[in-house]
C-alpha cells in the first residue's frame, strides 16, 4: 500500500509541475492574462510540497531522481495529448528505460 501511495504522489507531483509550468507558458508565451501566471506559480509551489509526502524512509536524492524519470514519461504523454506530437519509437524506448530505472532506484529492496 505504501508503494501505491508513493507512486500516486509522484504522478500528482508531475501533474502539478507540468500544469503549473504550462499555465506560466500560456501567460508568458501566448499572451494569456497575469492570472494564469499567478495560478501557475501557486500550483508550482504545491508541486514543491508534494514530494515531502513520500514515505518517511525515503531520501531526497532518490525521491527527486525517481521523480525525474516519472516527469520524462508524463512529459512525453503531455506532448502527445496537448501538442499533438505523437511519440516515436525512440521516445517510447527512452521513456520505458527511464521508468524501469526509477522503479529500481526507488523501490528495489535494500539490505
Swiss-Prot record:
It is a multi-pass membrane protein. It is found in: Cell membrane. Keywords: Cell membrane, Membrane, Transmembrane, Transmembrane helix. One of its GO terms (cellular component) is plasma membrane. It comes from the Bacteria. SUPFAM superfamilies: Multidrug resistance efflux transporter EmrE. The chain crosses the membrane at residues 7-27, 33-53, 60-80, 85-105. Belongs to the UPF0060 family. PANTHER family: UPF0060 MEMBRANE PROTEIN YNFA (PTHR36116:SF1). This is UPF0060 membrane protein CPR_1507. It comes from Clostridium perfringens (strain SM101 / Type A). The lineage of its organism: Bacteria, Bacillati, Bacillota, Clostridia, Eubacteriales.
